[in-house]
Regions:
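NUDIX/MutT-family hydrolases
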Residues: 119-121, 129-162
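Acidic, metal-coordinating catalytic segment for phosphate/diphosphate chemistry
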Residues: 1-31, 102, 109-110
């Protein structure tokens, strides 16, 4: 695969939305079979060190499943259990503040780019080991998320797990 020069990619990022995958790992809460914990990573961001879901852009020629697996490997060295034709559970938008919608559209904050996040809840295989952008990994109940979270991440998680906003 040919990668774009950094300057050209930066120009593209400033000119159009970027297709991304956003996902959280899930596992049963310790001692239960019905409650779920979500896996989040701690990472550097424009907001300092924050907890957030995993994900990133989809590369040209890459399927959604391949993008999900690549980001899981690069951040946590795990594989994912995915159906053959995986479909997003939610589509979430991320905007820089200067172009963020003011009409009440739910969105996350990303000062770097406008992104369309195909969002997933996925099972994984292996033991998560933080690497690459992941400084740490933790599993949390949706009712007890860590702080600080990337702005918009909590709203995305609540939509993925159909929880009311706090």
């Amino acid at each position: 695969m040919t990668l774009l020069p950094a300057t050209l990619y930066a120009q593209i990022e400033q000119s159009m939305p970027i297709a991304c995958v956003d996902f959280v790992l899930v596992r049963p809460k310790s001692g239960t079979t019905s409650l779920t914990e979500v896996g989040l990573i701690l990472r550097h961001s424009p907001f300092g060190e924050v907890w957030c879901h995993l994900g990133g852009r989809i590369q040209r020629g890459e399927t959604i499943a391949q993008a999900l697996r690549r980001h899981a490997r690069e951040a946590l060295d795990v594989d994912l259990k995915l159906p053959r034709d995986i479909q997003p559970s939610y589509v979430y938008q991320w905007f820089p503040p200067d172009i963020a919608p003011s009409d009440g559209t739910l969105h996350g904050d990303d000062p770097r780019k406008h992104a369309i996040g195909l969002s997933f809840v996925v099972d994984f295989i292996g033991t998560p080991m933080p690497q690459g952008e992941a400084l740490d990994v933790g599993f949390f109940s949706i009712e007890n998320l860590p702080a600080p979270l990337w702005p918009g991440c909590e709203q995305l998680l609540r939509r993925l797990f159909r929880q009311p906003s706090s």
